[in-house]
């Protein structure tokens, strides 16, 4: 798929003549980008995929961690997880782990990687070129593996974790290689996880041998000076961390200090959430019970409770008024009964004090009151009479005393 680039021309009448197609030729191998750039520098302008790195060039990466290649070496014929990851990274893009704790920093094939250039930034399809390069890499890796088998068996290292594999012939070695390649590819991380975020963090100290991939500064394809700038920027693409009991304490302290200044990326977790979508079916018969969402149901329940309380208050207000009236009436009746009883008892007591009606138990209250009035008046008249009689008796006494005194004086 050719890309066309137009340069600004001073003669505006020939702007459309300045548009020249940009082609990629298939004679070159993995470094065909540099060759295409050198060839097209005289004929046509650079493609947008070549100078786009200059626009998105990031800051230099921090200093790298010390190499742990010696810790990852194993003496068994069955390669470890780190060896499998190294194999896959060498197979799928040259030196994708340039300047990391696994590979040597002098390999610059990551700058010329076909997969990164094509999948991430180029605008054309390079399937045939990719198949060609991958097949060549596969053949070279098979040859190097067959030659390096005895040398790998003589390397010192810890005993193998599993049982030793059976003696491998050509078919068995190919099957073992495919098994190793599948196991290593299963442990890899996709390119969508590799390239969006910068790499500046380390894996957790308790994790096993795992690959944490990320891009700190993208490569630029523009000549030797730009490649030297990339070397100064120290591109760190892959960092492998192996859990060692002796290094767990130091890594935990450094991790605690780095967590404050660097974000922690966790795998994306997709949770299912239920969205309440209620659509009325006009063709369905009307139902007495209507389903509502949880929030509406709570609001309706609360509204119903409030309505019930208000209705209960409205209904209970006459009931409470009637009950209050009944209570008042009952209280009034009780008090009236007590008053009548007291009045009757008082009439009975008054009747007992009047001699004329004292023995008449059926005497009416009016008769009792009349006889009581007459009796009181008679008692008052008797009182006045007795008082006058007492006064007469006192005077008589005085006269008698005076007469007695005169008699005593005459005898003396």
From Swiss-Prot:
GO-annotated molecular function: DNA binding; DNA-binding transcription factor activity; protein dimerization activity
Region of interest (Leucine-zipper), ranges: 386-407
Alphabetic keyword roster: DNA-binding, Host nucleus, Oncogene
Biased composition range(s): Pro residues: 156-169
Biased segments, Low complexity type: 241-255
Domain bHLH as annotated: residue spans: 327-379
Compartment(s) where it occurs, according to its Swiss-Prot or TrEMBL record: Host nucleus
Gene Ontology CC annotations of this record: host cell nucleus
Disordered, as annotated region: 144-173, 208-263, 309-328
Keyword Transferase: no
Keyword DNA-binding attributed: yes
PROSITE patterns, per the entry: BHLH
CDD domains: bHLHzip_c-Myc
SUPFAM superfamilies for the chain: HLH, helix-loop-helix DNA-binding domain
Bias kind Polar residues: ranges: 309-320
Principal subcellular localisation of the protein: host cell
Pfam families in the cross-refs: HLH, Myc-LZ, Myc_N
Residue ranges, compositional bias (Acidic residues): 225-236
PANTHER family: MYC PROTO-ONCOGENE (PTHR45851)
Description of how the protein assembles with itself and partners: Efficient DNA binding requires dimerization with another bHLH protein.
Protein role: Transforms avian and murine macrophages and fibroblasts as well as murine B-lymphoid cells.
Additional observations: This protein is synthesized as a Gag-vMyc chimeric protein. The sequence shown here corresponds to the Myc homolog fragment of the chimera. The MH2E21 virus appears to be a recombinant between ring-necked pheasant virus and a deletion mutant of MH2 that was constructed in vitro. The MH2E21 virus lacks Gag, Pol and Env genes, and thus needs a helper virus to reproduce.
Protein name: Viral myc transforming protein
Classification of source organism: Viruses, Riboviria, Pararnavirae, Artverviricota, Revtraviricetes
